Structures are given as C-alpha cells and as structure tokens.
Regions:
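Conserved small/polar residues in nucleotide/adenosyl-binding loops
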Residues: 258-261
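Structural detector for short beta-strands of small beta-barrel domains
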Residues: 97-110
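OB-fold (S1/OB) nucleic-acid-binding surfaces
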Residues: 113-133
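OB-fold nucleic-acid-binding modules
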Residues: 11-97
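Extended, charge-rich, solvent-exposed interface segments
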Residues: 10, 14-18, 133-150, 154-230, ...
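Beta-rich nucleic-acid/ligand-interaction surfaces
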Residues: 237-254
C-alpha cells in the first residue's frame, strides 16, 4: 500500500503543477476565474430535469412511439432517427433556457463538440458543449479544462438520442480552477482511512455518501426541532477530545495525535 502511494505521489504532484500553470495562463490572459464572485443560477439539476419532463409531456404527450415492426435494422434506425428529429424540432420550437453551475466530474471531447457531467447541490446534469455555439476561443479554453473545475453554464434543455436530458450550452464560464486532483472516476477512494479523514473528497466523488449525510442532517434537524418545541436545552458533551481525561479510563492515542506535527 505504501509503495503504491509513493509511486502515485510524483504523478499527482506533476498534475498539480500543470494545473497551476493553466491557472497562471488564464490569469495572464485576463481570465482569472477567482475574480468572478457571483453567478446567476436559475435552476438546480433536479429542477432542470423536472421542468423538461413536464414540458415534454405537455408537447409530446399524445405522440405515439415509433413503430419499427417489420423493418430491417437499417430501416428501423432511419425510422427512429426521423422520429427523434421530429420530436426534437417540436421541443426546440419552444425552448426552455436555464442557467446552472457545478463541478465538472466527467468530460469527453469529440472534435468540434464535447459532453461533460456537471454536479451541483441536487445532482448531476450532462451538458453538450459545441464550438459553433460558444465560440472558438471559449471552446479552446474548455478543452484545456480539468476534472474538478467549476463551471457556470447557460443554454437550453434537450434530450439526446440516447434519451438523456441535457443542456445545450450557449455560454460557459469557468468559475473556479481546481488545483487538486480528484480520485480516479471508476475506483474512487479505495483507502478507507482517507475516506474518513478527507470527507470533503468522499462527498464529491460518492453521491450515495452525500445522500446519507443529507438524510442524517435532516433527521438531526427534526430531533432538535422536536426537543426545542418542548423546552429542552442542548448541552454539548464531547466524547473524544485532544487531551486525555475521564476518571480511571486509560489514555490512548488516536489518528488525530498520530497525524499532528
């Protein structure tokens, strides 16, 4: 385990150095993301998904699904594509414009267009980034971006051919440059001790862990609300502190002491 960490450390340090150079280049070009202190957000990701589904039901609710029975593979593909294009034309005729922001968790660049996943407080949303839509300079900057960077995106909602609700970006703004390297997407944080000591990373990488903390917070909030309504007083009684103490209990060292300088 230790040898593996040592082997990975130089690579991580090199990536951090590259990211710092990217930040410096942005600052030298007058595009310092840390100068942006406010970004107008109209919707969270869950709201974007909900309003599009409602709008889609309103416009396409009575439209039957495409019938491919009796068609060969090529004909079926053409029929499905034609149906998608018709549905897309109907939806695009009355677009829903949104503005949202979040951390980029995934990016796939494909020439003149790219896809990325943006995670915010309420979930994740795919964004379609096109050079023709946002401009060559903005697209070139986006291609240089890293996983973990925080973006603000303005555009309209649509559904891809694979059925995923996405946002077609018309404007993209880098709000914060991530200098630290997030764990690898598919394996995440494999070190259990690191998960507990660096909860902020665990919450970024694992939505299910975040969901657990959200539920815990709501439960504690309701318990406090219940007791406050009955004039109970909350008294903090820490069970683990930095100094040894407690009657005849034998002092012991913790990870807190072990990692302290």
């Amino acid at each position: 385990m230790g040898d593996n960490k040592s082997a990975q450390q130089p690579d991580v340090n090199e990536q951090i150095k590259v990211r710092m150079e990217k930040l410096k280049n942005l600052q030298d070009a007058g595009k310092d993301p840390f100068q942006i202190t406010k970004y107008d957000v109209t919707h969270h990701t869950d709201e974007i998904r909900a309003i599009y589904e409602a709008h889609e039901k309103e416009l396409l609710g009575d439209r039957p699904a495409v019938n491919t029975e009796g068609l060969d593979e090529q004909q079926a593909r053409e029929a499905v594509n034609a149906d998608y294009n018709e549905r897309r034309a109907i939806m695009d005729a009355s677009p829903i414009n949104v503005s949202f922001a979040g951390r980029m968790m995934f990016k796939r660049v494909m020439g003149k267009a790219s896809f990325c996943n943006i995670a915010d407080l309420k979930g994740r949303m795919q964004a379609y980034i096109s050079r023709d839509a946002i401009g060559e300079e903005a697209y070139a900057d986006f291609k240089k971006s890293d996983i973990g960077d925080i973006f603000g995106i303005k555009g309209f909602i649509f559904r891809t051919k694979t059925g995923e609700i996405s946002v077609h970006a018309e404007e993209i703004t880098l709000l914060s440059k991530s200098l630290q390297v997030l764990p690898e997407k598919f394996h995440g944080i494999t070190d259990t001790d690191m998960r507990y000591r660096q909860r902020y990373v665990d919450l970024i990488m694992n939505p299910e862990v975040k969901d657990t903390f959200v539920k815990r917070s709501k439960i504690i909030k309701e318990i406090r609300k219940f007791l406050d309504g009955r004039d109970f007083m909350e008294v903090e009684t820490p069970t683990l502190v930095s100094n040894a103490g407690g009657a005849a209990a034998r002092p012991f060292e913790t990870c807190l002491l072990y990692t302290s300088p």
